[in-house]
C-alpha cells in the first residue's frame, strides 16, 4: 500500500471542522433468519444454513420473522425513536458476489423507526446528544473470503469463496444525523457512540453484540469543512469497522488524510474505504453510490409491517434500565472509578456483580473475583463466567476471606471446588479441610521449629534485618500447607525472634 501523507491532527483541527456520521449494523440474535426458516448461527460449516429463499433460487418466497420485528421495535424504542405505524420493505439492487439474489431486502423511505437520540459522555466529562435519523430492518449479506493477493481484498485475489450462512440474517441499521461540533473529540465521539449502541443492544438482549464476530459493525462517515465556511465537504465512508479502538483510529486517520489532501489543493473522492488494522490506515474501495443508484422499489413479496399501538406499548414495558442511567447509578453506589466500571461492563458481568453485591459482598471484592479468577477460568474453558458459579456463592466466598477463614490462595482452591460442583464454599472448606489455621499455639510451634533449623536467619533478624524473616515465614507456610495467615505468621516470627 502506497504511503499517504497525513497532516498533524492538531493542525488539521485548526484548519477544518470534522463532520461525522455513523451507520451501525446490529445483527439480531433470532433463532432463524429474517425471511426464511434457516438457522441463524455463527460458526456453522460453510453454506450449511441455506435454503432456496436465502439463496435467491426460483420459487423461494420470503416470510417475515416476527421475532425480528419485535426486536427491531424494542431497539427503536430504546433509542428514543418514534415507531412507524406502517413500514415497508424495499429491494436495494446492486451486484456483489456475496449477494445471492442480486438485491438486498432492506427498507428505504419507510423505516420501522425514526427520529431518536442517544446521549454519550466523553472521558473529559463532556456530554453530547447524537441524533438518530432512522433505524431500519434489512438482511445481511454473505461472507466472502478472498484467496491470494496481498491485501486480502477482492482486488488482486486469485479467487474468492462465499459462505451464504450469514446471508439473510436479520439486521437493524442505525443511521445518525449529521454530527457537528465534535471538534478535537471526533475520534472519541465515534468510539463512545458505538460503545453506547453496543451497550444498549446488550442490555435489550436483541443481539449477542460481539464485535469480533461481526454482530455489531460500523460504517464511519467523515468529511471536513474549512473553518469559516458553511459549505460541507465531500464525505468518505469507511466500511465495516468492527472494534471500538479501530473506529477511533479510523476517524482520526481520515481527518488527517483528508486535511492533507485539501490543504495541498486536492479534492476528496466520494467513496467507500477499507480500514486496515495492521497499518492503521484506510484505502480506497469503490465510488460511493447515492440512493438512486440502488434503484429502490417496494418489495412485492412482502406486505407492510403495521404494529399496533397496543403491541408497541407492551414492548415499551419490557425495556430494561438504560445502560447510561445504570452506569451512573451503579458507579455511585459501588464507588468505582469510570475505568473500574468499564472493566466490568466490557466483561459483560454487570448482572453478576450486582447480584453478588446484593447477596452481601463488598463491591471491591465482588469485582476482584468476577474480573479476576472467575474470568480466568471462564476464558480457559471457553464459557461465560456467569455459567460457572452463582453470585450468592461468590458473595459467600468473599465473606469467608473477609472473616479471615480463608486466604486468597485457599479461596481460589475453594472456588475450584465450587465450580467442580462440590457444594457451597463453606461445604468445600469443610470437605477439603481448607480453613486457615487460627490457633496461635500451632503456629508458634511451627515457627520455633523453623527458627531452630535456621539459626543464621534468627541472628540476622535479631540484628535488625527483618527482611530475613521471609525464609522462616516461607518454611512455616509450607509446614502449614498454606493454611495460615502470612501476616499473622510474620507478626509471630518477629515476636519469637525478639525473645
Swiss-Prot record:
The keyword Metal-binding does not apply. Its EC number is 6.3.5.-. It comes from the Bacteria. One of its GO terms (molecular function) is ATP binding. Keywords: ATP-binding, Ligase, Nucleotide-binding, Protein biosynthesis. It is an enzyme of class 6 (ligase). It catalyses: L-glutamyl-tRNA(Gln) + L-glutamine + ATP + H2O = L-glutaminyl-tRNA(Gln) + L-glutamate + ADP + phosphate + H(+); L-aspartyl-tRNA(Asn) + L-glutamine + ATP + H2O = L-asparaginyl-tRNA(Asn) + L-glutamate + ADP + phosphate + 2 H(+). GO terms for biological process: glutaminyl-tRNAGln biosynthesis via transamidation; translation. It holds the Pfam family GatB_N. Heterotrimer of A, B and C subunits. Allows the formation of correctly charged Asn-tRNA(Asn) or Gln-tRNA(Gln) through the transamidation of misacylated Asp-tRNA(Asn) or Glu-tRNA(Gln) in organisms which lack either or both of asparaginyl-tRNA or glutaminyl-tRNA synthetases. The reaction takes place in the presence of glutamine and ATP through an activated phospho-Asp-tRNA(Asn) or phospho-Glu-tRNA(Gln). HAMAP family: GatB. This is Aspartyl/glutamyl-tRNA(Asn/Gln) amidotransferase subunit B. The gene is gatB.
Amino acid at each position: 500500500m502506497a504511503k499517504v501523507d497525513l497532516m498533524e491532527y492538531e493542525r488539521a483541527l485548526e484548519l477544518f471542522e470534522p463532520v461525522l456520521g455513523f451507520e451501525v449494523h446490529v445483527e439480531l440474535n433470532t433463532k432463524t433468519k429474517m425471511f426464511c426458516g434457516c438457522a441463524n448461527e455463527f460458526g456453522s460449516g460453510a453454506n450449511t444454513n441455506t435454503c432456496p429463499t436465502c439463496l435467491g433460487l426460483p420459487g423461494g418466497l420470503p416470510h417475515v420473522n416476527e421475532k425480528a420485528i419485535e426486536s427491531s421495535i424494542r431497539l427503536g424504542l430504546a433509542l428514543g425513536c418514534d415507531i412507524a405505524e406502517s413500514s415497508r420493505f424495499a429491494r436495494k439492487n446492486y451486484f456483489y458476489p456475496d449477494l445471492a439474489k442480486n438485491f438486498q431486502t432492506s427498507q428505504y423511505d419507510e423505516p420501522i423507526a425514526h427520529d431518536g437520540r442517544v446521549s454519550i459522555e466523553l472521558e473529559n466529562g463532556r456530554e453530547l446528544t447524537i441524533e438518530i435519523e432512522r433505524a431500519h430492518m434489512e438482511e445481511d449479506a454473505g461472507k466472502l473470503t478472498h484467496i491470494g493477493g496481498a491485501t486480502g481484498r477482492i482486488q488482486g485475489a486469485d479467487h474468492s469463496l462465499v459462505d451464504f450462512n450469514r446471508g439473510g440474517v436479520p439486521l437493524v441499521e442505525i443511521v445518525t444525523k449529521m454530527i457537528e461540533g465534535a471538534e478535537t473529540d471526533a475520534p472519541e465521539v465515534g468510539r463512545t457512540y458505538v460503545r453506547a449502541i453496543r451497550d444498549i443492544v446488550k442490555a435489550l438482549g436483541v443481539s449477542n453484540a460481539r464485535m469480533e464476530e461481526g454482530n455489531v459493525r460500523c460504517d464511519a462517515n467523515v468529511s471536513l469543512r474549512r473553518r469559516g465556511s458553511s459549505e460541507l465537504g465531500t464525505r468518505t465512508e469507511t466500511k465495516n469497522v468492527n472494534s471500538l479502538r479501530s473506529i477511533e483510529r479510523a476517524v482520526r486517520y481520515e481527518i488527517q488524510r483528508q486535511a492533507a489532501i485539501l490543504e495541498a489543493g486536492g479534492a476528496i473522492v466520494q467513496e467507500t474505504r477499507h480500514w486496515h488494522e495492521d497499518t492503521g490506515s484506510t484505502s480506497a474501495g469503490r465510488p460511493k453510490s447515492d440512493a438512486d443508484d440502488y434503484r429502490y422499489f417496494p418489495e412485492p413479496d412482502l406486505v407492510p409491517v403495521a404494529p399496533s399501538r397496543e403491541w408497541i406499548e407492551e414492548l415499551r414495558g419490557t425495556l430494561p434500565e438504560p445502560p447510561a442511567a445504570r452506569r451512573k447509578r451503579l458507579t455511585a453506589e459501588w464507588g468505582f472509578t469510570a475505568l473500574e466500571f468499564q472493566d466490568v461492563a466490557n466483561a459483560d458481568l454487570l448482572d453478576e456483580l450486582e447480584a453478588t453485591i446484593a447477596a452481601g459482598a463488598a463491591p471491591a471484592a465482588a469485582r476482584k473475583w468476577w474480573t479476576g479468577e472467575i474470568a480466568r477460568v471462564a476464558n480457559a474453558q471457553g464459557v461465560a463466567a456467569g455459567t460457572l458459579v452463582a453470585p450468592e456463592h461468590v458473595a459467600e466466598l468473599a465473606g469467608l476471606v473477609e472473616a479471615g477463614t480463608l486466604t486468597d490462595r485457599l479461596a481460589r482452591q475453594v472456588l475450584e471446588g465450587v465450580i467442580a460442583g462440590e457444594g457451597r464454599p463453606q461445604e468445600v472448606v469443610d470437605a477439603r479441610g481448607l480453613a486457615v489455621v487460627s490457633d496461635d499455639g500451632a503456629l508458634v510451634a511451627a515457627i520455633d521449629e523453623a527458627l531452630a533449623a535456621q539459626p543464621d536467619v534468627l541472628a540476622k533478624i535479631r540484628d535488625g534485618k527483618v527482611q530475613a524473616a521471609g525464609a522462616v515465614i516461607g518454611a512455616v507456610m509450607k509446614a502449614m500447607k498454606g493454611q495460615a495467615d502470612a501476616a499473622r505468621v510474620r507478626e509471630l516470627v518477629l515476636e519469637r525472634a525478639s525473645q
